[in-house]
């Protein structure tokens, strides 16, 4: 791995710190603003140089598509967008690792999931939040779970009655998801045990 110039080290440190504080990499515009570049294109050139030196990977097609290669993979894996038909913790879904003590929660957190949408806002789970999840299939009615219906992953409150399962939102603008286990496949990926927002546990 080649040595970094002082400027490249600045860019790398900014990316690492941004991921540790917010759970996601910065955009090119954010890098440019933080380091005083004239434009996001200047940030892009530094990112390409870092990629050539093997310290980051640029993921095409995403404004935050930066993955650190030098980081040790300690901490909780952060799961972003999940592709259909693939395991939740598949390598390609892991955006990075978040340095937090999994023992802060009981039961302990095994991974973080980036929340998409506002269906659970009335209990304080907002779009973009990171949900701390304990990986288990042993859940009870009334608990907030991460569920996979066929190929879609969702966060909802569980209500099970025989072969019928309702996944209940915490927002009156959303309808419950009703699953007939005789016709659809439902997999419980885990139990919600906490929320992180803007780098702070709630």
Curated annotation (Swiss-Prot):
Recorded hits in InterPro entries, A to Z, give: LexA (IPR006200), LexA-like (IPR039418), LexA/Signal_pep-like_sf (IPR036286), LexA_DNA-bd_dom (IPR006199), LexA_repressor (IPR050077), Peptidase_S24_LexA (IPR006197), Peptidase_S24_S26A/B/C (IPR015927), WH-like_DNA-bd_sf (IPR036388)
Q: Which UniProt keywords apply?
A: Autocatalytic cleavage, DNA damage, DNA repair, DNA replication, DNA-binding, Hydrolase, Repressor, SOS response, Transcription, Transcription regulation
Q: Which GO terms describe its molecular function?
A: DNA binding; serine-type endopeptidase activity
Pfam families registered for this protein in UniProt: LexA_DNA_bind, Peptidase_S24
Which reaction(s) does the protein catalyse, per the Swiss-Prot or TrEMBL entry? Hydrolysis of Ala-|-Gly bond in repressor LexA
Output one GO BP term: negative regulation of DNA-templated transcription
DNA-binding residue intervals: 28-48
Sites annotated Cleavage: 84-85
Give the main EC class.
hydrolase
Heme as UniProt keyword: no
Q: Which cysteines are joined by disulfide bonds?
A: none
Cite the EC number: 3.4.21.88
> Subunit structure, briefly?
Homodimer.
PANTHER family in UniProt: LEXA REPRESSOR, LEXA REPRESSOR-RELATED
Family recorded in the similarity comment: Belongs to the peptidase S24 family.
Give the protein's function: Represses a number of genes involved in the response to DNA damage (SOS response), including recA and lexA. Binds to the 16 bp palindromic sequence 5'-CTGTATATATATACAG-3'. In the presence of single-stranded DNA, RecA interacts with LexA causing an autocatalytic cleavage which disrupts the DNA-binding part of LexA, leading to derepression of the SOS regulon and eventually DNA repair.
The record ties this protein, via HAMAP family, to:
LexA (MF_00015)
UniProt-recorded name of the protein:
LexA repressor
Q: Which organism is it from?
A: Erwinia tasmaniensis (strain DSM 17950 / CFBP 7177 / CIP 109463 / NCPPB 4357 / Et1/99)
What taxonomic lineage is listed for the species of origin? Bacteria, Pseudomonadati, Pseudomonadota, Gammaproteobacteria, Enterobacterales
């Amino acid at each position: 791995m080649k040595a970094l110039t002082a400027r490249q080290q600045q860019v790398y440190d900014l990316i690492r710190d941004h991921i540790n504080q917010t759970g996601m990499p910065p955009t090119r515009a954010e890098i440019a603003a933080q380091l005083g570049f004239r434009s996001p294109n200047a940030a892009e050139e530094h990112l390409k140089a870092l990629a050539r030196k093997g310290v980051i990977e640029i993921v095409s097609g995403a404004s935050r598509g930066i993955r650190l290669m030098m980081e040790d993979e300690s901490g909780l894996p952060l799961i972003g967008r999940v592709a259909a038909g693939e395991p939740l913790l598949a390598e390609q879904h892991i955006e990075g690792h978040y340095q937090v003590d999994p023992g802060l929660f009981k039961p302990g957190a095994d991974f973080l999931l980036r929340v998409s949408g506002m269906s659970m806002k009335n209990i304080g789970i907002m779009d973009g939040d990171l949900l701390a999840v304990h990986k288990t299939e042993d859940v009870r009615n009334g608990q907030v779970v991460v569920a996979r219906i066929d190929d879609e992953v969702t966060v909802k409150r569980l209500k099970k009655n025989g072969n019928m399962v309702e996944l209940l939102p915490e927002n009156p603008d959303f309808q419950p998801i009703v699953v007939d286990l005789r016709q659809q496949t439902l997999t419980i990926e885990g139990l919600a045990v906490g929320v992180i927002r803007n780098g702070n546990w709630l």
